[in-house]
Amino acid sequence: MHPVRLFCWHFMAYPNLPEDFDDNHSSGWVTVPNKLWDREKSRGLYQTYIDQLAYGDELGFDGLVLNEHHQNIYGLMASPNLIASALTQKTEKAKIVVLADLPPLYLNPLRVAEEFAMLDNMSNGRLIAGFAVGGGPESFNYNVPSPHGRRRLWEAIDLVVRSWTDEGPFHHEGPCYPLRYVNIWPKPLQTPHPQVWVPGSRSIESMEEVAKRGYCYFLSSRSHGDGTKAAALEFAQVMEKHNKTYTPFNMGVLLSVYVSESDEQAKAEAEKPVWYFLRNCLKGHLRQKGKSMTFGPGVPSQSLRSWEAFLNAPRSSGRMLGDADSWDELEARNSIIVGSPETVREKLWGFVEQAQVGNLLIQFHFGNMEDKLARKSMRLFAEEVAPALRRDSGNLFDQEFPVLRDLELEEAV
């Protein structure tokens, strides 16, 4: 059987903001004053978050997901590779997914190649290597013109993968990274190299680049419905164009989930940290308020026409996750799934059955959620949601995608 792969994703949000943050600050990104960092309240915060992820390994999640952001309260992982390094020593089975490093921000992508190779060895071959261009905030923070980012990204990915697979030293004469000596030590443990994942937002250009290289496409969206199924169909068509066959494991999605003993208890426990996350952490990212700081012509790769349309659109249109006014609106768009094990299992199965995406990257911790609540949600999910989800999805995928059985036979030979 080939069941869904269930990953635990942690964003490591800053949980110690003043209650009036939304009233007094224009954004949680780029310009958010770092005087709000409370040293004493934040003592041990990284240890708590790392331990939550390590708990995911104990519970049997297939992987643990990290990502890179800069100068914000949404995610405190300026270097996800540091967190990944800690996890290599605290976990045994789960894949460690860095989704993603942002090589366009760096002078030399070989640093990413070397660190990923180290992590693959330190984890005994459990690394999944993610690469991304970065968003508008990163363009501002690192003063990297976003229109150049995509060219830098794909040259960097190709160079990193070649450094893992080709014998060195060799020279690389790329337009962005001309290098006389490419000869990394160590090589990754996995052969030919760790699996590569690349995020995208349904642009055909990104899908094309991912598909022709045979990588996994991660749909970078927090709203799910018909759009996710449409994206999967689009990617399948692009893969077919490149003589490849789509399976659910060629694509991944982000889901946000909270599980408790009943629907009522789940809402009561999750409501405060969820609104903290939406109102504060998404301000300037997935919320119209503050968005102009990190979204504009050329940021990220935004055309002037798209920017004008954004400015002229009525505020009721183009609503993002952080613009939600009510709990009913959140539930209607399937952005955050909150409920009893039965409710969560039913909703996730409906999503998997419709979208037929095999890598589910699940956020369990929101904003300022207490450690004990995040752990309870993870445990209930692992014990009372995951078994049926794996069983039913395995049957579905094997029936709908016979190529999976063929791949299994090839691996056994």
Language model features: what each stretch is:
Residues V32-Q47, A100-L110, P192-R202, V257-S260, ...:
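Active-site mouth loops of central-metabolism enzymes
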Residues H2, C8-W37, R150-W185, D226-A355, ...:
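An alpha-helical appendage that flanks or caps ligand/catalytic pockets
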Residues L6-H10, L64-L66, I96-A100, L127-F131, ...:
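Hydrophobic faces of well-ordered beta-strands that scaffold small-molecule active sites
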Residues M1-K95, H193-P194, E400-L404, A412-V413:
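N-terminal beta1-alpha1-beta2 module of alpha/beta enzyme domains
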Residues D57-E58, A84-K93, F116, D120-L127, ...:
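Acidic (Asp/Glu)-rich catalytic clusters
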Residues V65-I83, L102-P103, R222-G225, I362-A374:
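Glycine-rich, proline-tolerant flexible connector loops at the mouths of alpha/beta enzymes
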Residues R202-A232, A236:
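A conserved active-site cap/scaffold subdomain adjacent to cofactor or substrate pockets
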Residues G56, E68, L87, L119, ...:
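Conserved, mostly hydrophobic/aromatic
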